[in-house]
A protein has these predicted regions:
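Gram-negative bacterial Sec-dependent N-terminal signal peptides
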Residues: 1-24
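Sequence/structural signature of beta-propeller domains
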Residues: 26-640
């Protein structure tokens, strides 16, 4: 390594250790730093480029001077008085959204900067936390929702919804808590890759999924010796497409990391030995490389410079289109993996009085109205899947019937539905020889008979003819067949007398639903680029115009729609996203789904889609079910 020092100038050159994949693989990597704003009357604890300004304007957060907008020479253009530290920003239309920590109030603060008029909007504050907030960073998701991550002492972290589109929310909403490393102070988010980066001072840098519906997980970007190449400490970071720049404040070094399809590799290390304690870092990507701002020793000295490094951007998967839930059920009364499968009962005279049924795998069957309010709870055991059909003779009474798979007794639990009030009552139980029952679905052909298909973890399917001639439910086993691996979701097309069934790691099959026909499997769609394992819930949308099969693609938190007739043309995939205006989170890790084409009134005039939500956010609670207007799915996927 060769270092030359000029008056007020640092020239640092790295001649080796570059990745072969970078544009500079065969050339020296030069970082030229010069003192910046040396004679200006402020001391900045945090420094950042104003996004969209081509590096000509900078933001500074100062404990004594407030929040500042500065020109390229460090001259003040605007000031928001106060005591601040920590900075992040995002372009918002013609303005810039700025997040910082207000030291006087001990709260995260957000404001809008009009960079042309050099004026600030009225600040919005995240509520006071019960821990000391050390750092913060912004994240904008694929739908334009704006979040702030808070990094606190002793491993505390939170994600807050603070805006949507170009607007800040008057009242930020807590989305979820995050277990973060102890001794974390800095974070950054790669919006395109939905990656949150957090430092752990004595260990290294970590990457977490940033999406609010993502599961909590982390993977290392780089670690301290002897596990990695970091000499002493992991500090501040800056992100550019395909790359991460990170400071070792005690080892006085700048590390460069190239993102790969899986993980990160070192692209080099630059010595900063002439600095006292490099603590802050901001990067602006230009045509000829990177512009850098470095904060040394708590703002005692500020540096700017250029780095001739252009990391290779990693391809990012295109975002799936999204629809928004308009309603959600109350959370189930059990924690963990509890809510599972919904069904929709349509009131024969008053559709607005229809019901949504939902299974609780740790309790029983739940009944909701169309606003999501719980009306009934039937604690009959660990129910997995549920399905509904109208018109079942329970002795001399004509009722509608719900049937659920009961994992406590490997049986089918039957429930009568009063056709006037919608009230559910237990109506009997049918034992099965399955050792681990999973799914169930109903089939009612034109002759009026009612059949139940029950499946087990070993791939077995049992078809029962249901009846209750004396008021006591009974099931006659009329057919058996089997798939090779674990199934669960299934749904019948009564009109065409077909059964669709999901094999979790394989795909979806179609088979003749008639009891006297051979069970010859025909492939509908395989697990692959569109449908991701596990294949969970299946639902059948039937209308006078088109019939569709809807599938829960649990592996990537999405839903796939295909035509319900051969050749089963793919119509698209979508996600259920966060409804910021209604304060309803999106859905993820979905098990069961259900759909109806019935006109239930209002937003549900073209039908309703119900999906189980495996990760309840905003606030974090037990699992529940989300209600989506089918009309929005039609519009989003341009369904005929």
């Amino acid at each position: 390594m060769m270092i030359s020092v000029l008056p007020k100038t640092l020239c640092l050159a790295l001649l080796s250790g570059l990745m072969a994949s970078t544009a500079q693989a065969s050339s020296p990597l030069d970082l030229n730093l010069t003192r910046w704003a040396e004679n200006q009357p402020f001391k900045a604890q945090s420094l950042a480029f104003v996004p969209g300004s081509d590096g000509t304007q900078r933001l500074a957060a100062s404990v004594k001077s407030g929040l500042l907008v500065l020109d390229a020479q460090g001259k003040q253009l605007a000031q928001l008085p106060g005591s601040f530290q920590g900075l992040d920003s995002r372009v918002s239309g013609s303005q810039v959204l700025v997040a910082t920590l207000d030291n006087a109030r001990q709260q995260a603060m957000l404001t809008r900067l009009d960079a042309d008029r050099h004026s600030w909007s009225k600040p919005v504050y995240v509520p006071v936390r019960d821990y000391s907030v050390a750092g913060l960073c912004l994240y904008r998701d694929e739908a334009g929702n704006l979040f702030v991550f808070l990094v606190g002492e002793e491993g505390k972290g939170e994600q807050w919804l603070v805006g949507a589109g170009d607007q800040l929310n008057d009242a930020p909403r807590l989305v979820r808590h995050l277990p973060l490393p102890p001794n974390a102070e800095f974070c950054q988010v790669d919006d395109a890759a939905h990656q949150l980066y957090v430092n752990e001072q004595n260990i290294g840098w970590w990457a977490y999924p940033a999406h609010p519906e993502a599961h909590v997980a982390r993977q290392p970007v780089a670690l301290r010796e002897p596990f990695g190449d970091v000499k002493q400490a992991a500090g501040a970071m800056a992100i550019v497409p395909g790359g991460l720049l990170a400071l070792d404040p005690r080892g006085k070094a700048l590390h460069l990391y190239q993102q790969q399809a899986q993980g990160w590799t070192s692209a080099g290390e630059l010595s900063l030995m002439t600095l006292k304690k490099p603590e802050g870092l901001s990067v602006n990507q230009g045509k000829d490389g990177l512009q850098l701002l470095v904060n040394d020793n708590d703002g005692e000295r500020l540096y700017q410079g250029a780095l001739g490094w252009t990391p290779t951007p990693v391809p990012v998967q295109a975002a799936l289109p999204g629809v928004l839930p308009l309603a959600q059920t109350q959370p189930v009364a059990r924690q963990g993996d509890a809510a599972d499968d919904p069904a929709i009962w349509v009131h024969p005279q008053k559709p607005a009085l229809s019901r949504v049924l939902g299974t609780n795998k740790k309790q029983g069957l739940l009944v909701y109205d169309l606003t999501g309010k719980q009306l009934q709870s039937l604690p009959v055991g660990r129910l997995n899947n549920v399905d509904v059909r109208p018109g079942f003779m329970l002795g001399q009474r004509n009722v509608d019937l719900a049937v659920a798979s009961n994992r406590d007794r490997n049986s089918l639990s039957l429930f009568s539905i009063d056709r006037t009030t919608g009230e559910l009552r237990e109506a009997g139980e049918i034992p099965t020889p399955l050792t681990e029952i999973y799914g169930v679905c109903l089939f009612k052909p034109a002759n009026g008979e009612l059949y139940a298909f029950a499946n087990g973890k070993d791939g077995s399917f049992l078809q029962y003819r249901l009846s209750a001639p004396n008021g006591k439910a009974q099931g006659d086993l009329v057919r058996r067949f089997k798939v090779e691996t674990q199934p669960e979701g299934c749904v019948a097309d009564d009109q065409r007398q077909r059964l669709f069934l999901g094999e979790e790691d394989v795909g979806v099959w179609e088979v003749d639903a008639r009891a006297d026909q051979p069970a010859t499997l025909s492939s509908v769609i395989k697990v692959g680029d569109v449908l991701h394992a596990d294949v969970e819930g299946l639902a059948f949308y039937q209308s006078e115009q088109h019939d569709y099969l809807v599938m829960s693609s649990q592996g990537n938190d999405s839903y796939v729609v295909v035509d319900a007739e051969p050749p089963y043309a793919l119509r698209g995939a979508f996600r259920v996203g966060l409804n910021a205006q209604a304060g309803i989170d999106g859905s993820s890790e979905t098990d069961g789904i259900e759909v109806t084409s019935a006109n239930l009134g209002g937003a549900w005039s073209r039908g309703m889609l119900v999906v189980q939500d495996g990760r309840k956010r905003m606030p974090e609670q037990a699992q529940n079910f989300k209600f989506v207007p089918w009309a929005d799915v039609v519009k989003t996927l341009s369904l005929p």
